[in-house]
Amino acid sequence: MASTFNIPCNAGTIKNFNNSQRNLGFSSNLGINFAKTRFSNCGDSGRIPSQLVVRASERRDNLTQQKTGLSIEECEAAVVAGNAPSAPPVPPTPKAPSGTPSVSPLSLGRRPRRNRTSPVFRAAFQETTLSPANVVYPLFIHEGEEDTPIGAMPGCYRLGWRHGLVEEVAKARDVVVNSIVVFPKPDALKSPTGDEAYNENGLVPRTIRMLKDKFPDLIIYTDVALDPYYYDGHDGIVTQHGVIMNDETVHQLCKQAVAQARAGADVVSPSDMMDGRVGAIRAALDAEGYSNVSIMSYTAKYASSFYGPFREALDSNPRFGDKKTYQMNPANYREALIETQEDESEGADILLVKPGLPYLDIIRLLRDNSDLPIAAYQVSGEYSMIKAGGVLKMIDEEKVMLESLLCLRRAGADIILTYFALQAARCLCGEKR
């Protein structure tokens, strides 16, 4: 067959057809035989005309059809005469099982299943994607040298900050997970006012400095809250009557955020749910010269029962009462808009919903009402349920894991904090390689 190319009239003169490949810029792997190149209306000038007709070579590297033995010219003549070589027959329509009723086709103007018939179609029309860039890896750290397993979270450990943590971060980076969030377990350093939270030589600042030294481009999120440092396990300072003090707690949180930023944190993440903390932290960071440090606010953090394994990991269960006076009621929907508006006005850079999968409607609500990036936290209870189901062979752990993360993305999450980050990224990279 012949192919026609439109080319500029002022192209250089062809001195030798054997050099046409170089002059015209065609690569040799195109299967074009330039010895059989036919130029139309060249005249005697030797100049390349504005229209070039090129015949394909008879060579085919991957030809699987049976050869007819005819030349290209003979094949073309046969087609013109209506004697084209026969193509494979149309495959027969699959037979229905015996007993299938005979019915007239439904009169449907649209059949959505047509766009699902092929893996190629399904991939082309996929609306939501998931990649390692969409996940943030939460990591638990402690002062010890050894990595200790967390019983309620299979596959998760309290990592020794000098060795185990570095190894885990290196594994994550191997599969393009370059964002982490660290949660400390400062065993014997709890106090009534959580002062260890802003100790610049404390576990978290030391860890940040070490990681930034080893992995300068690593994005480090930090947790801003007092519960790991407060002996009663609450996220704020508590009065003698068990009341969580808001403004006094915010004062401590500002010092904690500045200490983390000074150590090199990229994103500070207040998870305490105190009123006004985002604006106060933003002002404190800016005053200290850290205007480029982002704030990911736990905007809609619910008083959920899905946090149990996490609290075991950090030994941060409340010693009395619960956290319902500052975390949101799981029954509430519109309240999330109030928190969204407040956090946006106070200078938040990222809005987070926690937990994740049980609160897809809240993720979508924030996505539809804010232009800021939305984060979702697939919390410890969600992780442990999937792990347990996989161990008991009740579900396919890998497929459910990936589906759950894809659902969070579909609901509107730009990034997902998930303990599956490393496992999921390995699966995703394996699928694409």
From Swiss-Prot:
GO cellular component, one term: chloroplast
Disordered, as annotated region: 83-115
Gene3D superfamilies reported in the protein's UniProt record: Aldolase class I
Principal location listed in the UniProt entry: plastid
Cystine residue pairs: none
Domain of life where this protein originates: Eukaryota
Active-site residues, as the UniProt record annotates them: K301, K354
Sequence positions that bind 5-aminolevulinate 2: S380, Y419
Binding sites annotated in the UniProt record for 5-aminolevulinate 1: R311, K323
Enzyme class: lyase
Cross-referenced CDD domains: ALAD_PBGS_aspartate_rich (cd04823)
Subunit structure: Homooctamer.
Function: Catalyzes an early step in the biosynthesis of tetrapyrroles. Binds two molecules of 5-aminolevulinate per subunit, each at a distinct site, and catalyzes their condensation to form porphobilinogen.
Annotated protein name in UniProt: Delta-aminolevulinic acid dehydratase, chloroplastic
Organism whose genome encodes this protein: Spinacia oleracea (Spinach)
